[in-house]
Amino acid sequence: MNNLFSSVLFNLIIVNAATTCAIAAVASPPAKVVITPASFSEREGILIVAQNQGFFRKHNLDVQLVLMPNAPIAFSALTAGESQFYFGTTSGTSLGAVVNGLDGVFVAGFINKLIGGFSVGKEIKTPNDLKGKQIGVASLGGGNWMFTMLAFDHWGLDPKRDNISFRIIGNTGVRAQSIAGGVIAGSILGYTFAANLKRVGYPILADLADLNIPFQDSALFTRKSFLNQHPEVVENVLRALLDSISFIQSLDNKNAVLKSLTQWLRLAKTEDAVEGYEFMRKLYTKRIYPTVDGIRNSIRVLSMTNEKFKGLKAEDLIDDRIVRKLETEGAF
């Protein structure tokens, strides 16, 4: 009898402990997370959809998306601990931060090649016509500048030799207006703004996706110290973004995605977001591994202008432990 009572009591304790743990897990407050994109295009649509559709909340996250004016300011926030993640590309800013001592790594990659529309003035017909012209960028050393340098490298153009100058203009919308106003000869824009310019006569010199240039485009970057201390937060952010990709790629959700993209890009009409929506469906990958080749390509181009980048190794800039875990568990 005593043995039976002891056995029942032991089982009750185990059940009670398990129930208490389960309740505690459910009741635990969501982790507060700040993600800072520094680009204003469809690339960031994955974040907006995840927010609007409640995927971050689903994975116990309280996420604040803060659009930064440029990558240097975004990295200042990351360095100061005011944000936990940067959503963006390999650039002089992101790689330069590591060179200068930031313990940063790319934990996932969502677009792993160079993309965007190189929109130009009506007088530009070929890449050689860009010689002697002024090209608009969001910042020197930032992602948009890096896109431009990789395109020039592909076309055999050298800004110094060919007298091509850069003018810091601002985000995609402002650069589009500057092309139409004749302030600059061209700039790499998001597909939505490039398509809208094309409708009024300003050509797209090239769809950079067609050039198949390896590049770490949209990716999630964080500090190693944060990853080591809070791997569960990183995992939950990636789970939410995988949910977002699945949602975007389902045609059943087209209207909801268009609504989110229209809101994000501050467009007057939903119809103006269609090109950006089609881009999002095609170019996001569910195999969200960062690309070593793409990061290596960025290091190569940056090393042409500054030798300090030559000491970087692409492999050291990646920590894909969470992505590997997710793949093992069948998340993609």
Each language-model region and where it sits:
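Short, low-complexity disordered leader/linker segments with a strong preference
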Residues: 1-32, 332
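Short, glycine-/small- and polar/acidic-enriched structural segments
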Residues: 25-171, 175-181, 185-191, 204-214
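Hydrophobic alpha-helix position signal
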Residues: 50, 56, 97, 152, ...
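Short amphipathic alpha-helical segments at helix boundaries and their inter-helical linkers
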Residues: 83, 87, 280-294, 325-331
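Pocket-lining segment of extracytoplasmic ligand-binding domains
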Residues: 92, 173-265
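Secondary-structure end/capping motifs
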Residues: 228-310
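Conserved C-terminal helix/tail region of periplasmic/extracytoplasmic solute-binding proteins
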Residues: 299-332
